[in-house]
Regions:
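Amphipathic alpha-helical substructures
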Residues: 52-141, 165
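Short acidic/polar inter-strand loop motif in beta-rich domains
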Residues: 217-227
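Extended catalytic-interface subdomain
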Residues: 21, 39-40, 54, 58
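Beta-strand-rich binding/interaction modules
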Residues: 108, 122-125, 129-199, 203-217
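Terminal edge beta-strands and adjacent linker/stalk segments
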Residues: 226-236
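Single conserved hydrophobic/aromatic residue that forms the stacking wall/gate
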Residues: 1-12
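Active-site-adjacent bridging/hinge elements
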Residues: 28-42
Length: 237
């Protein structure tokens, strides 16, 4: 996703994702066509491959998706609280997700249902980028949800002057938003109704001033096809 010099600098700061290997394992599971819901009892998986990837690769990805949704601070404090409240006990998956909801102030059962009880995948893309009426000097970006699983989005816009602005799009069903994670300018826009396949993001900037647009440049979302997550409008010289 780090296609311009400025974005590469930002991504170097966010590099070293310890979940990259788990994400590759999950990707191979999806591409194999053998994936089964994580909630399947271990003895009832059709293949050992699907069981192993679900238990280890997708299990690690699950935690990283929670981290992405609620933010680093809430995730860390939630994990510590989970350990303190449930050590030497027998928690269920619902005990974990309820604790994370309390810690973050968000509704998370939708994520748990999609990621654990189904094999629906995450896949977002930039469908189109167009200038609006010249009088307004704004730009319209149409985003599309190709996969069946919804997620909140971090959309980065790099301008020709080298500055970067993040547009954060919550999912309506989560009833909340994560705090900012960096020092770049950040705008929280209207939430995305989870049943809608497309979303229009209007930028208060003319098309000529935009160099590139990226969905999830930190590459934390378990997007099964991120080739459509970047649109470069003006190439660097």
């Amino acid at each position: 996703h780090c296609v311009t010099r400025r974005q590469r600098q930002m991504c170097i700061r966010d590099s070293g994702n310890p979940h990259a290997g788990s994400m590759r394992g999950y990707q191979r599971l999806v591409e194999s066509g053998k994936e089964e819901p994580m909630a399947t009892h271990a003895d009832h998986y059709h293949t050992n491959f699907a069981y192993g990837r679900a238990a280890y690769s997708k299990g690690a990805v699950y935690l990283n998706q929670i981290r992405y949704i609620i933010g680093e601070e809430a995730f860390r404090s939630g994990m510590l609280r989970y350990h303190e409240e449930w050590k030497l006990k027998h928690p269920t998956d619902l005990d974990f997700i309820r604790l994370m909801e309390k810690e973050s102030g968000m509704i998370l059962d939708w994520f748990h249902e999609y990621f654990v009880h189904t094999t629906k995948t995450i896949d977002y893309g930039i469908k189109s980028v167009d200038a609006t009426e010249k009088e307004t000097g704004s730009t319209k970006i149409e985003l599309e949800r190709i996969g069946l699983m919804p997620m909140p989005l971090d959309v980065w816009v790099e301008y020709t002057d080298g500055s970067i602005e993040e547009f954060y799009i919550p999912v309506r069903i989560m009833r909340g938003e994560k705090p900012t994670e960096h020092t770049e300018k950040r705008t929280v826009v209207a939430d995305w109704p989870w049943v809608e396949p497309t979303y229009t993001l209007t930028l208060p900037a003319s098309l000529e001033t935009i160099r590139a647009i990226s969905i999830d440049p930190s590459q934390r979302i378990a997007d099964v096809n991120n080739t459509n997550n970047v649109r470069v409008l003006i190439s660097e010289q």
